[in-house]
UniProtKB/Swiss-Prot annotation:
InterPro entries: Cyt_trans-like, NMN_Atrans_arc, Rossmann-like_a/b/a_fold. This is Nicotinamide-nucleotide adenylyltransferase. Homohexamer existing as a trimer of dimers. The lineage of its organism: Archaea, Methanobacteriati, Methanobacteriota, Methanomada group, Methanococci. GO terms for molecular function: ATP binding; nicotinamide-nucleotide adenylyltransferase activity.
Length: 168
């Protein structure tokens, strides 16, 4: 059985890792949709789709998982979004999402949709991790070591801080 999960993964953190490990107990293969794939270099979406794929693949390389990271651009056309996703991915049997819109769209198309258990959502949040990066607070413990390495390699914290500057 193949499952599908989508997220922005800005950045990929330990909460995402725990959700994927849990899903792997229920399915044989996981399609990991990299949402908002066209977005990067903003405070909300600082990392490119390629950088996020690197974060995910490096974080999962020590786990015995079969997964497919697939970049998925936003199309702003909800009624056909599921068909769009299906056209980009291998077929899947079950969808994992806590997002109400994603849940409704897939349920309306006849998919079984499960709400994954969220892990420490207060700290394991991309918004919180990016806030900590901007403010010079500790964030490294909230992401897998591989993600720390990728963010250092791409100078991700420096990028985020430059993006936060104003022209005043």
């Amino acid at each position: 059985m193949r499952g599908f999960i989508i997220g922005r993964f800005q950045p990929f953190h330990k909460g995402h890792l725990e959700v994927i490990k849990k899903i792997a107990e229920e399915v044989d293969e996981i399609i990991i949709g990299i949402g908002s794939a066209q977005k990067s270099h903003t405070l909300e979406n600082p990392f490119t789709a390629g950088e996020r794929i690197l974060m995910i693949t490096q974080s999962l390389k020590d786990y015995d998982l079969t997964y497919y990271p697939i970049p998925i651009k936003d199309i702003e056309f909800n009624s056909i979004w599921v068909s769009y996703v299906e056209s980009l991915t291998p077929p899947f049997d079950i969808v994992y999402s806590g997002n109400p819109l994603v849940r409704v769209l897939f349920e309306e198309r006849g998919y079984e949709v499960k709400r994954p258990e969220m892990f420490n959502r207060k700290e394991y949040s991309g918004t919180e991790i990016r806030r900590r990066m901007l403010n010079g607070e500790k964030w490294e413990h909230l992401v897998p070591k591989a993600v720390v390495d990728v963010i250092k390699e791409i100078k991700g914290v420096e990028r985020l801080r430059k993006l936060a500057q104003t022209d005043k």
